[in-house]
Amino acid sequence: VSKVTWKSEPDPHDYPAAASYLSLIATTDQINDLIEQLKAAPLSHYKAKDMLRASGLRLLPQDNPHVAADVTKVKNNKALSPVLLIRGDLAHGITLQIADGYHRVCASYHLDENTDIPCRITNHPHNAAR
């Protein structure tokens, strides 16, 4: 099994990609706040299996072109970018949002579900006032 290596910081284009996804579920003001919070957040680590469980997303198959591309990167010893997460809220039924990096999470899971994935994570806007 190939070991996943990770970059120390998200790629610059990960933030606009996260904003694009978030534009489907959040207001422009919320998106701007979330992106700034993600940029300022320290790196944390969570397991691939836990990210998928908390997000409620299904594991994409290994033959998904984007997942396969990330698996190939790992096998070629290329580092993957940390993922960007918005923390869910269990009490309100809000799941974790993988704002950027879903395919990387799936690729990592296929290689080892216990992979510790570096991420930047911030609270859901619903929790920000608490």
Enumerate the predicted regions with their spans.
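An acidic, glycine-rich, mixed-charge low-complexity segment common to nucleic-acid enzymes
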Residues: 1-64
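Short alpha-helix boundary/capping and kink motifs at helix termini
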Residues: 38-97, 109-110
